[in-house]
Amino acid sequence: PKTKLYRIGPGSANRIQFRVLDSVNALRQAAGVSTLQMDAKLNAAAATHSRDMAVQNRPWHFGSDGSSPIDRVQRAGYSGRMVGETISETYETELQTLSAWMEEPSTRAVILDPTARDLGFSWHQESNGKIWWTMVLGSPDLAAIPGMAAAPLDSAVNAG
């Protein structure tokens, strides 16, 4: 039987982003770590990288301009610490992609990182149906919380 191509329709962004947030939070709760909240600036960083990976036609963590995940998060205006980034080039749905990430120890560690508090998730879909997914996790600036110290931005964990 012919498989149906997964197409993301216009106006689906919020539904997809919150479906992923709910799924990630269920996985995090099951692992005994705190839940995340959606962050618009991390969403913007993820969207920028998804489009850029499509232009480069390769799934990797560096932008065509040499930018790192940390650079993109800072450019998007996120003032916290970047915890990690997961990426994928696939024809699979967001939940199939999340499941695949959870099967890999390096990406699972990013998704379940206990220091993360914020989530950004976005994608770029090509006309042939290929989807470039990017998830970015961050932690707010802990220096603003009494009794907490901020971790340096360069301590990010990047996983593929």
Where are these regions (language model features)?
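Mature, folded catalytic cores of secreted/periplasmic enzymes
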Residues: 28, 36, 74-76, 121, ...
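Disulfide-stabilized extracellular recognition modules
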Residues: 1-3, 7, 14, 88-160
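A short alpha-helix/helix-coil micro-patch that ends at or immediately precedes a cysteine
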Residues: 1-56
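Short, surface-exposed glycine/acidic/tryptophan-bearing loops
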Residues: 43-93, 111
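Short glycine-/small-residue-rich flexible loop motifs, especially phosphate/cofactor-binding loops
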Residues: 25, 70, 108
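Loop/turn elements at helix/coil->beta-strand transitions in domains of secreted/extracellular proteins
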Residues: 29-34, 78, 82-83, 116-119, ...
